[in-house]
Amino acid sequence: MAISKEKKNEIMAQYARHEGDTGSVEVQVAVLTWEINHLNDHIKQHKKDHATYRGLMKKIGRRRNLLAYLRRTDVNRYRELIHSLGLRR
């Protein structure tokens, strides 16, 4: 199931850097994290759903690249983001 518009707007409002911010790294990573967590729950129930597993791996790779970019450019924002999302780095 894809993320609902309401949930996505809620995440954007929480992690946006300014009014109307929809594309900052923080917002993208937060949305990807929600989607990854949702897909993880799906994969636990449907172990043989390989297409969803592949999509999950692509989202994890995209999030990893965005986090690496953020760490390279602004370490303080990176640390705040991983702390607020509860990621293990």
From Swiss-Prot:
What SUPFAM superfamilies does the database record attribute to this sequence? S15/NS1 RNA-binding domain
One Pfam family per UniProt: Ribosomal_S15
> Which superkingdom heads the taxonomic lineage of this protein's source?
Bacteria
Tell whether tRNA-binding is among the UniProt keywords. Answer: no
Which terms are listed as keywords in the entry?
A: Ribonucleoprotein, Ribosomal protein, RNA-binding, rRNA-binding
Repeat is among the record's keywords: no
State the Gene Ontology terms under molecular function. rRNA binding; structural constituent of ribosome
Any Gene Ontology CC annotation: cytosolic small ribosomal subunit
Query: What Gene3D superfamilies does this protein's entry cite?
Result: 6.10.250.3130, S15/NS1, RNA-binding
Q: Name one GO biological process term.
A: translation
Residues spanning the signal sequence: none
The UniProt function text for this chain reads: One of the primary rRNA binding proteins, it binds directly to 16S rRNA where it helps nucleate assembly of the platform of the 30S subunit by binding and bridging several RNA helices of the 16S rRNA.
PANTHER family with a match to the protein in the record:
RIBOSOMAL PROTEIN S15, BACTERIAL AND ORGANELLAR, SMALL RIBOSOMAL SUBUNIT PROTEIN US15M
Q: Which family does it belong to?
A: Belongs to the universal ribosomal protein uS15 family.
Please identify the protein, giving its name as recorded: Small ribosomal subunit protein uS15
Q: Give the originating organism.
A: Streptococcus suis (strain 05ZYH33)
Name of the encoding gene? rpsO
